Amino acid sequence: MITTATRWPSPAKLNLFLYINGQHDNGYHELQTLFQFIDLCDHLTITPNDSGEITLSPPIPGVEKKDNLIWKAATQLQEHTLCPLGAHIELEKILPIGGGIGGGSSNAATTLVALNFLWDLNLTNKELADLGVTLGADVPIFVHGFSAFAEGIGEKLQPANPKELWYVLIKPEVSIATVDVFSHPELIRNTAKQPLNVLLSASYENDCEKIVRRVYPEVDYQLSWLLEYAPSRLTGTGACVFAEFINEKEAQHVFSLIPDNATGFITRGRNTSPLNQALEEYKSLCNI
């Protein structure tokens, strides 16, 4: 067991497109989506110990410990492997909550991947992903760590290699719960499934965007503003919206014009997760 503190990235993702093809009786939706990581990250500093306890800092406002995905991921990993070890986990929160960029799922995945290494558990990525999907449908993509085309409820992954563009990401002054969008009676749920090559050659869209723009005027305003400058879309169920650019200079120019009431970021697409890169670096340091 490594006993020193190590720092792990917990990256955001974008849904470059998102199509909803149907709904299961259990409420989950059939979808087709293209995930890409971005280099905007939370960070987890993890210090393993032999206490058997999982402690967290700082608390996330409005989130009880038992509902914290970091704590749930760590305790689930303990229980699955009968691991007697513990850890203190400190979260540096950058990613906006309720933004549709996978912050909570990414935190859970980083916890699973990091503790699997730090506790020397040797679970495969598939085993970690199978644990993670019980915490959230997006957790497997963060565990596997490659950009991917996803089907099913998001768990069927096929590696993909979209262009690593620059993005201006805006978080409107509203947080959106995924369940509120997916349960809306007017949400599009019958988009026909298409082969990946057809989807990649068409213009990218998000089936959640129409209803989100209508229900949340803050999203509509920021997306309308971005569309004046570049191709722009909602990611996931929102609230974050993004515009895409070929180079950093163009992104920087539009970023400089963002309205004062908006929270924005410049970021770049990454087809290999920063988490994967960190894991390989730690393995190299430990001669694994």
From Swiss-Prot:
Superkingdom to which the source organism belongs: Bacteria
Keywords: ATP-binding, Isoprene biosynthesis, Kinase, Nucleotide-binding, Transferase
Chain sites annotated for binding ATP: P96, I97, G98, G99, G100, I101, G102, G103, G104, S105, S106
Enzymatic reactions: 4-CDP-2-C-methyl-D-erythritol + ATP = 4-CDP-2-C-methyl-D-erythritol 2-phosphate + ADP + H(+)
Entry keyword Acetylation: no
EC assignment: 2.7.1.148
InterPro entries: GHMP_kinase_C_dom, GHMP_kinase_C_sf, GHMP_kinase_N_dom, IspE, Ribosomal_Su5_D2-typ_SF, Ribsml_uS5_D2-typ_fold_subgr
Catalytic residues (positions): K13, D138
GO biological process, one term: terpenoid biosynthetic process
A Pfam family per the record: GHMP_kinases_C
Disulfide bond positions: none
EC category name: transferase
A GO term for molecular function: ATP binding
Pathway where it operates: Isoprenoid biosynthesis; isopentenyl diphosphate biosynthesis via DXP pathway; isopentenyl diphosphate from 1-deoxy-D-xylulose 5-phosphate: step 3/6
PANTHER family: 4-DIPHOSPHOCYTIDYL-2-C-METHYL-D-ERYTHRITOL KINASE, CHLOROPLASTIC
The protein's role, per its UniProt record: Catalyzes the phosphorylation of the position 2 hydroxy group of 4-diphosphocytidyl-2C-methyl-D-erythritol.
Family listed: Belongs to the GHMP kinase family. IspE subfamily.
Protein name: 4-diphosphocytidyl-2-C-methyl-D-erythritol kinase
Lineage, top ranks: Bacteria, Pseudomonadati, Pseudomonadota, Gammaproteobacteria, Vibrionales
Gene: ispE
